[in-house]
Each structure stands twice: as C-alpha cells, then as structure tokens.
A protein has these predicted regions:
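A cross-family phosphate/adenosyl-ligand binding-site feature
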Residues: 1-94, 102-179
Length: 179
C-alpha cells in the first residue's frame, strides 16, 4: 500500500482482509497480519513487483488521476505502479479505486485503457441508497465493494437485497405495533 495505509478505506480493507485493526510495527511486520509485508514505495525490485509473485489480486486505493494515467500508459515510477503493471501482465484481478472528481477526458481515456487491459475501475462513490448514518457506513460500503470485486468474502453491510429486507421488516414492525 502506498498512501492507502493512512486512509480510512485502506485501514478498513486491512481490518477486513487481514484482521489488522491497529497500524503498528507488529501488525505490519507479520505479527498479527499473517503474510503482510511492507515495502518502501520506491522499491520497484520488491517481490510483489515480479510476475513470479503469486497473489489473488490487487486494489489500488485511493488511486489518483496521476497513478491511473501511469498505470494506463505502462509507466512504473513506484512500487504501486509497477505491481499494477505486473498484475495486468499476469492477468490477475486489478481494481483501481479512482478518487478524484470531476473526471476529465484524460481520466476517462486512462480508465478505458486500463479496463481494456483487464482492470476494473471502481470510483470511490459510496451507495447512498443504503441510507448511511455515518462516515464509517460510507467507508464500509466502499471497502465491501472493493472486496467483492476481488472475490473476497466479507460481512460488511452493502447488499441492496439485504437492505430491502431490513426496510420491510422495520415497516412490518411499525404497522404491527398497537397505537
């Protein structure tokens, strides 16, 4: 992770994926994080930048327009960009969570290029239809969507059908309560 470890969404993904709830040296060195390893952002020679490194997929979150453009054009100035290039080359799942708005034509073209190369572009736009009550609800939604896109099971409340079922149950309870 480059920058994402400091963001709420990055922290939520670490919690859901690896059970890491506190970012400290122990957690990030593998103590509680299992196989989690940190590399400096400029270490383009790290194992995860090699096609022989086995993994189930990669999420770039949050992805700036600069990072998106560099991935789209095969430019690898840092480890995140290099690992993303290798992920595409090896035909593994790559999800790019673009963070910027408004989206201009150059970003749209970069999104087209990475999509054609096999990536999924998932703008960081949370589902307001679930009627979030807090910023954490919005973060949970986006973390759950990103995990879904990688095929990772989770328990985050993001399903529309589950939300509808909860609404119906609440409505039944309101109507069955004597006034």
């Amino acid at each position: 992770m480059n920058g994402a470890a400091r963001s709420n969404l990055g922290k939520r993904l670490l919690a859901e994926e690896a059970g890491i709830t506190k970012l400290d040296a122990d957690a990030l060195s593998g103590g509680r994080g299992g196989q989690l390893v940190m590399h400096p952002g400029n270490d383009v020679g790290a194992a995860c930048a090699s096609g022989s490194f086995r993994h189930d997929g990669m999420v770039v979150v949050p992805a700036s327009s600069n990072t998106l453009a560099k991935i789209a054009h095969g430019i690898s100035d840092n480890l995140v960009q290099r690992a993303a290039q290798v992920t595409l080359k090896e035909r593994r799942p790559l999800v790019i969570a673009h963070r910027e708005s408004p989206i201009g034509l150059t970003e749209i073209e970069a999104m087209r290029k990475v999509t054609e190369a096999g990536a999924v572009v998932a703008p960081l736009s949370p589902g307001l239809y679930l009627q979030p009550e807090s910023v954490n609800d919005l973060i949970d939604f986006m973390a759950g969507r990103l995990l879904d896109l990688l095929g990772v099971d989770h328990q985050l409340p993001i399903r529309w059908d589950e939300h509808l079922a909860e609404q119906r149950e609440a409505k039944r309870e309101r109507h069955s309560t004597p006034r």
